[in-house]
């Protein structure tokens, strides 16, 4: 199979056009202009609100003018991540894709199918002339990945439909009817630097090759967190060396909503201890590889000497390492409802650590399907960093989306799926934030579902789209549109 044979052709044509447009989160200007031009070229009513959300209206197929207006929604931004050795500028370069069996992938970068494929499906519907449907509003929100900015800023009344299909889910055959709320915690350790004592040897230690992934949807897949592993080594080694280890820098992770997949630390030890530290690192690497022998089979541990540099003051460095060692990470509780007892309810992910000249900045992300538990988890993380002397702030929270009892749209979506594929879809919640949570606050009467084609390893350079599921989602969506129209 080559790219010219991908089906539905109209959807993949639109996806290819989208991937020519740089669209990092918070930098969606080119995508907004593309969507405006698209709507105007097709003579469709096109609106852009103050936040940068785009809405394109398409009138009903003749004979279905009195049908319920249905909203199709996706987000226009993408997570930008690449392999360390790949030369790529997400603000200028087009995503380069290729077919690998039944999967569409990108060459060394994130693919942008989250949520570019949702946008492509909407554009294909807007461009098509042979689909039966009632009135449609296609909505494209901005900056979903780094703050849900578009959904936060959307005012009541921008959308007018009473049913909404969110096209930002990642497992075909699953219809999502609820999602987790979330919040981020930001901790900063301020420090002064000093010269290391005489007789110290400087070492650089790195870890890469982890799977990473989405910190909500992938948090229960027993994937390693690069930050927690590197902090664990620092804590262990400092204990072995009677507190003599001196830290220079700690850098790992890029996005608040991704499990960090690589990282690097620079530190100094006494000359007399350097060979023991190398031996300890090798033993530690072997132990960690064994712990994750199923889920992380490409871990790469490296240690080398490096140039001397001013070290972080001892008291702050030790408290920073202890805080990272102590802070909760991973899935913490599962849902109490028997029907979804397998699903993660509450989790936390230490997402990024960045060292500047005089401070270390940490971002951790908390999620829960129960808002009171979200608050408690956020306070737990906050307390760990406060105890260590950090300056802590908490970001805006976004709400959970609760399952709607007797949802007409859910019923229509399930029946359409059964009609097409002869089996029931799985109706479930997701342990990740969807814009549906915010929509449910602004539009409390809005009936919503979320589904999409199968994606794997989102938010990483290994992101992949399962090609056959795009046509399945396309057929499913068209059947729902016909059902609503009739």
Predicted features along the sequence, with ranges:
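Acidic/His- and Gly-rich active-site-bordering loop/insert found
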Residues: 2-102
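Active-site-adjacent substrate-binding region
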Residues: 225-227, 232-250, 403-446
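Substrate-recognition/cap regions that form aromatic- and gly/pro-loop-enriched pockets
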Residues: 343-432
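Midchain, well-structured core segments that form catalytic/ion-binding scaffolds
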Residues: 102-105, 145-146, 156-367
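His/Asp/Glu-rich mid-to-C-terminal helical/loop segments that flank catalytic regions of hydrolases
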Residues: 36, 157, 222-240, 271-274, ...
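Zn-dependent metallopeptidase/amidohydrolase metal-coordination segment
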Residues: 7-11, 345-360, 421-479
